[in-house]
């Protein structure tokens, strides 16, 4: 039986077929571990589980990678408020997440990469983007992706740049607002970050959430875009 999925780029249902080894490579957005995952979060993870099982039912294998976002504005703010190390703060919610997955009988992914374990890959990817001329360093040491330098940027979300509102903040990596214009790949260290930060060619700082999934997807699924990706609309 032929299985079809919706292609966000072409805007139509298309047959799903593995590129090699009869294996569908699937990258899915996992939790930002600043709090316990709620029922809305698990709706997404349950859907991904159903999708995974449907692929397997149709005779294909699955290699699923689900990221864990353990450094961003919310995790840092929570750790600082609780006066604990970021790693200790996020580990509590990582453990709770995996316990809940087991209770819900959701099949485990093959890999659960945490953002803080892949900072070198993220820095290397930002360096490549700068070399290609599609990213630039700002005066404060942050690095931004220049959306105008990448032909076709916005096609997935059908963004009309000419009619976008200007003046909206795009440096913060909060998930509850849209990014207008260039967005942060690397965020320069600020006093509110406390002890959280990593050294980079642009100074001390931390990755923006946009670069995290790109680096980890490349690491575990390869740089060629030939895999399924499932996540929030902000990832489109």
Predicted segments with their positions:
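NTP-dependent nucleotidyl-transfer catalytic core
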Residues: 1-236
């Amino acid at each position: 039986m032929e299985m079809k999925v919706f292609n966000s780029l072409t805007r139509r249902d298309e047959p799903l077929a593995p590129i090699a080894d009869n294996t569908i490579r699937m990258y899915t957005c996992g939790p930002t571990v600043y709090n316990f995952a709620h029922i809305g979060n698990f709706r997404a993870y349950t859907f991904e589980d159903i999708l995974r099982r449907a692929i397997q039912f149709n005779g294909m294998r699955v290699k699923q990678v689900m990221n864990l976002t353990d450094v961003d504005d919310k995790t840092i703010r929570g750790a600082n408020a609780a006066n604990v190390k970021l790693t200790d703060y996020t580990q509590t919610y990582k453990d709770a997440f995996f316990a809940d997955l087991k209770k819900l009988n959701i099949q485990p992914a093959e890999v659960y990469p945490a953002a803080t374990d892949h900072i070198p890959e993220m820095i290397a990817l930002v360096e490549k983007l700068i070399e290609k001329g599609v990213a630039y360093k700002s005066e404060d040491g942050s690095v931004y992706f220049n959306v105008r330098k990448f032909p076709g940027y916005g096609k997935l979300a059908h963004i009309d740049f000419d009619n976008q509102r200007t003046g909206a903040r795009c440096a913060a990596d909060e998930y509850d607002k849209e990014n207008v214009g260039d967005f942060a790949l690397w965020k320069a260290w600020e006093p509110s970050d406390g002890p959280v930060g990593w050294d980079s060619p642009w100074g001390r700082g931390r990755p923006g959430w946009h670069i995290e999934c790109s680096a980890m997807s490349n690491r575990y699924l390869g740089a060629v875009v030939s895999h399924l990706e499932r996540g929030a609309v902000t990832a489109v």
